[in-house]
UniProtKB/Swiss-Prot annotation:
It holds the Pfam family Lactamase_B. InterPro entries: Clx_II_MBL, Glyoxalase_II_hydrolase, HAGH_C, Hydroxyacylglutathione_Hdrlase, Metallo-B-lactamas, RibonucZ/Hydroxyglut_hydro. This is Hydroxyacylglutathione hydrolase. The keyword Transmembrane helix does not apply. Zn(2+) 1 binds at H53, H55, H110, D127. Keywords: Hydrolase, Metal-binding, Zinc. It comes from Salmonella typhi. Thiolesterase that catalyzes the hydrolysis of S-D-lactoyl-glutathione to form glutathione and D-lactic acid.
Amino acid sequence: MNLNSIPAFQDNYIWVLTNDEGRCVIVDPGEAAPVLKAIAAHKWMPEAIFLTHHHYDHVGGVKELLQHFPQMTVYGPAETQDKGATHLVGDGDTIRVLGEKFTLFATPGHTLGHVCYFSHPYLFCGDTLFSGGCGRLFEGTPSQMYQSLMKINSLPDDTLICSAHEYTLANIKFALSILPHDSFINEYYRKVKELRVKKQMTLPVILKNERKINLFLRTEDIDLINEINKETILQQPEARFAWLRSKKDTF
């Protein structure tokens, strides 16, 4: 399978996974126009759409795309039923698309019904995990989001994190505000800054590296714990996650 990305809105990525025959699955098409343009340019044959959650910038193009390609199957959690989903999916489900098996797992936090799609090495995680960060808690609790991130963190080292937004630079700036002397984060910041100056994307990222630069995946890391302890003593990783998320919300 081949991974492709289509920029949308100000900072969204619509991911498109294709096979050698040109059949494709489209992930979180927030708008239809750039997808239709890419389909025409590459002569792709859309087979399915994956929806991770119900927010407009992830589902806004679904109904128009279905008008052009009514044969497509649209997979999504229950919260996307009125957004164009034709087949509802949830935690533990498996589906077969493009001849490959995708495993679904629930990742509540950003929204209550958020799901991720995984077919090694590709993880389509919507707004749950970003490079260097995680989604805002619009509907879920810190505990839910922490558990969702731990599900992702348990995946193989070579998992490719296909997030839906280009937030990496801002997220790394936040990480450095907490751990300013972390050598790996500083090195990553320089690389990301160079990419963004050239208007190049920073995604996808490998989970093995993400574990080093994403503080939300490092809540049991001694350096981070020591830094948090300067302000407050928090015994549980979930509490440290909630502290970080609160700090990021006002950063």
